[in-house]
Amino acid sequence: MAKEYSRTQRIGDQMQRELAELIRREVKDPRVGLVTITAVDVSRDLGHAKVFITVMGEETPDAVQQSLKALNSAASFLRLHLGRSMQLRSVPQLHFHFDESVSRGVHLSALIERAVAEDRLHKDADESDTKE
């Protein structure tokens, strides 16, 4: 059985694909780094869309802010091209936000790996104590 998706989810998914291609091809601003669009959340009335991005290779908050500033200033340009490619009657206003879930995931993975390594050390130390 096919999954049921709402119209806003389908539009958000299509916007994610289209925006990724538009940013790669059309945005020539040097402040925009290697941007990955992680999600697009479209409001129910299709008036606004939150576009969540990550910037690869740019871990400093200043570089991320510069990319966000450049993308938000190019939002009307991107919106115009989205309207042409998606053939929507009204294209949502675009609001770009940094997606911290990727960096949080990396941090949590590092914490888990460190905890596992410490458990192995304690386990090895306990086994060597019982052998003696």
Curated annotation (Swiss-Prot):
<dbReference type="GO" id="GO:0030490">
    <property type="term" value="P:maturation of SSU-rRNA"/>
</dbReference>
<dbReference type="GO" id="GO:0005829">
    <property type="term" value="C:cytosol"/>
</dbReference>
<dbReference type="Pfam" id="PF02033">
    <property type="entry name" value="RBFA"/>
</dbReference>
<dbReference type="InterPro" id="IPR015946">
    <property type="entry name" value="KH_dom-like_a/b"/>
</dbReference>
<dbReference type="InterPro" id="IPR020053">
    <property type="entry name" value="Ribosome-bd_factorA_CS"/>
</dbReference>
<dbReference type="InterPro" id="IPR000238">
    <property type="entry name" value="RbfA"/>
</dbReference>
<protein>
    <recommendedName>
        <fullName>Ribosome-binding factor A</fullName>
    </recommendedName>
</protein>
<comment type="similarity">
    <text>Belongs to the RbfA family.</text>
</comment>
<keyword id="KW-0690">Ribosome biogenesis</keyword>
<keyword id="KW-0963">Cytoplasm</keyword>
<dbReference type="GO" id="GO:0043024">
    <property type="term" value="F:ribosomal small subunit binding"/>
</dbReference>
<dbReference type="InterPro" id="IPR023799">
    <property type="entry name" value="RbfA_dom_sf"/>
</dbReference>
<comment type="subunit">
    <text>Monomer. Binds 30S ribosomal subunits, but not 50S ribosomal subunits or 70S ribosomes.</text>
</comment>
<comment type="function">
    <text>One of several proteins that assist in the late maturation steps of the functional core of the 30S ribosomal subunit. Associates with free 30S ribosomal subunits (but not with 30S subunits that are part of 70S ribosomes or polysomes). Required for efficient processing of 16S rRNA. May interact with the 5'-terminal helix region of 16S rRNA.</text>
</comment>
